[in-house]
Regions:
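Short amphipathic alpha-helical segments with coiled-coil-like heptad repeat character
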Residues: 41-43, 67, 113
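A general "terminal functional-core" signal
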Residues: 2-9, 15, 69-319
Length: 319
């Protein structure tokens, strides 16, 4: 029997990455997505795959040893915060965050070994964590680890990172700001109106990496029309910048009704972006793309947005 070309990751280890019932990043996000996947009869079309755990050496591809140690210690007593007040410590946070990273790396392995054409992890895309600190509900930055992992393990150098979460992907942008081989495209709510307050249009990279990054901010209340205009700029940018691998951070907090953001997109924006990137992946890098769930704090929106990404990943699939 042929291996199904789209891997989707599922397991209690992923669901354990949450900050409790009273926190926006709560415990139901993982299950809501998988319930919707089954309701739409998509579960039978993908290969449901268990999570994996990252090693300390893998975490250290991006994070400092002192920060890894800090999270490990906080995980033992589960008290306090890992940042200035957004990201609480909890018992087992080190293991839970390591499972997020390990699952993203497993998705890369599945694609690079030819087991999968696309892959999606709902609890991933923790784009605010920096090399030496947590931020914005993000403990370890699986995207940052993934970029180094691709380079060190598969000699994949020219990587495209696309972020359509309502929040700017500061943990990737600033830690790869001078990296000319990290192509970066981010559509987000205007940083003057939303955490982390970054991602201005004139931030295009520094040094040899100038013009390898594109930041496109949307005003509060922006709809699919404004997103489509921004996405056309992303596609134009990518015409001259073919990648070897694509990472899509597809946060669902850009949809109308999210409790902590103010954009008014629909899930059609996620489908459009995912379809476009799949076409680019098929054209330039043998279809290699992973999707990471990112943010999203309205459970209905999570279910709608992420399943649209899966539908896009299933279009014109090849074995």
């Amino acid at each position: 029997m042929k291996t199904k070309p789209v891997f989707v990751y599922k397991g209690d280890a992923l669901a354990k990455y949450n900050f409790g019932d009273n926190h926006p990043f709560g415990p139901k996000r993982h299950h809501v997505f998988h319930d919707e996947l089954e309701r739409l009869s998509l579960g039978a079309l993908v290969q449901i795959t268990p999570p994996s755990r990252a090693s300390i050496d893998q975490l250290a591809l991006f994070h400092t040893s002192s920060y890894i140690d800090q999270v490990s210690r906080a995980s033992e007593d589960g008290k306090g915060f890992l940042d200035d007040g957004d990201t609480p410590a909890f018992l087992g946070v080190f293991e839970a965050a390591s499972d997020v990273v390990g699952t993203t790396l497993a998705a890369i392995d599945a694609i690079m070994h030819g087991q999968a054409r696309r892959a999606f992890s709902p609890i991933g895309g923790l784009h605010h964590a920096r090399r030496d600190k947590a931020g914005g509900f993000c403990v370890f930055n699986d995207c940052g680890v993934a970029i180094h992992y691709l380079r060190e393990n598969y000699n994949v150098q020219r990587i495209l990172y696309v972020d359509i979460d309502a929040h700017h992907g500061d943990g990737i942008f600033y830690d790869f700001e001078d990296d000319a081989d990290l192509l970066f495209a981010d559509i987000h709510q205007d940083g003057d109106t939303l955490y982390p307050g970054t991602g201005a249009s004139d931030e295009t990279g520094i040094g040899n990496a100038v013009n390898t990054k594109i930041n496109l901010s949307l005003p509060p209340g922006a709809t699919d029309n404004e997103f489509s205009e921004a996405w056309a700029k992303v596609e134009n940018y990518l015409m001259d910048n073919p990648p070897e691998f694509i990472i899509l951070q597809c946060g669902a907090d850009s949809l109308a009704g999210d409790p902590i953001t103010q954009l008014n997109l629909t899930e059609a924006a996620h489908r459009m972006a995912a379809l476009s990137l799949c076409q680019i992946a098929d054209r330039h890098c043998d279809g290699r793309i992973i999707g990471l769930g990112g943010g999203g704090y309205n459970l209905d929106n999570i279910a709608k947005a992420w399943t649209q990404v899966i539908k896009a990943f299933l279009v014109n699939q090849k074995s």
